[in-house]
A protein has these predicted regions:
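Hydrophobic/aromatic ligand-binding patch that stacks against planar heteroaromatic rings
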Residues: 14, 116, 148-149
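ADP-ribose/adenylate-binding Rossmann-like module
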Residues: 77-141
Length: 196
C-alpha cells in the first residue's frame, strides 16, 4: 500500500541539518517533495554536510555508516490520494491502492539484505527503522528488511523506538506552549512529588 513520505523526508531534512553526508536512494517515480529536497540541499551547504540522490540501493549503501531503508509511496500518489479523500471517492482510493501495490511489486529487490549490508562501511553500518518494519519471512513474504538483519539490530531499534513518545510529547508541548522551558520549570517547582 501507499506508505507516507514522512520518514524519508524527515531524515533528509534533519540529518543534513546536523552536517551529515546523506544519500537518498529510490526507484524512478518515488520522488519526495521537491521543497524538502531543497531544504536538505540548503542544510547540507550551511553545515558542511552533503546531500545527493541516487537510483540504486547499492549506491546508497556503499561505504555507509548508517542505513535507514524505508518504503514509501511516490509524492504524486500522495497528492492523488488527498484529492480522492477530499472528494469522498472510496472507489478511486481503492483503485489507487491496487495501482500502488502493483507498482511496489516491481521493486521487491529493494530490501535490506545481508548482501546489501556487506556493502556498508566495514560491513557494519547501523541499521535504523521507524518501526514497524516489513520483515521478510516474519511479518510478510517479501519485506523491507531480511529477518537476520533485523534481528541483529533489535537493541538499537528498540532504543530508537523508545524515544518516540517523548519526542511526540515534546512536539505537542512546543506547539501548544509559547515558552516550554518556563512551563516545565514551573511544573517542576510547583510539584511536591518529583517525577524524574
Amino acid at each position: 500500500y501507499g506508505k507516507p513520505l514522512s520518514v524519508p523526508q524527515g531524515v533528509i531534512g534533519l540529518m543534513t541539518r546536523f552536517g551529515m553526508d546523506v544519500v537518498l536512494a529510490h526507484p524512478e517515480g518515488y520522488d519526495v517533495m521537491p521543497e524538502v529536497e531543497e531544504i536538505a540541499k540548503k542544510n547540507a551547504a550551511a553545515t558542511g554536510g552533503s546531500y545527493k540522490k541516487v537510483s540504486t540501493m547499492e549506491d546508497a549503501f556503499d561505504g555507509a555508516d548508517i542505513v535507514y531503508p524505508k518504503s514509501w509511496a511516490p509524492f504524486a500518489a500522495m497528492e492523488q490520494r488527498t484529492k480522492l479523500y477530499q472528494a469522498g471517492d472510496q472507489a478511486g482510493i481503492d483503485a489507487l491502492e491496487k495501482q500502488l501495490l502493483a507498482q511496489n511489486a516491481q521493486h521487491k529487490d529493494w530490501t535490506c539484505s545481508e548482501e546489501m549490508m556487506k556493502r556498508t562501511k566495514n560491513g557494519k553500518a547501523l541499521y535504523l527503522h521507524c518501526l514497524p518494519a516489513d520483515i521478510t519471512g516474519l511479518s510478510c513474504p517479501e519485506g523491507e528488511v531480511d529477518n537476520s538483519v533485523f534481528d541483529r539490530y533489535l537493541v538499537p531499534l528498540y532504543k530508537e523506538a523508545s524515544y518516540k513518545p517523548y519526542i511526540i510529547a515534546a512536539m505537542i508541548l512546543m506547539s501548544k506552549v509559547k515558552d516550554p522551558v518556563s512551563a516545565l520549570m514551573a511544573l517542576d517547582q510547583g510539584s511536591k512529588r518529583k517525577l524524574f
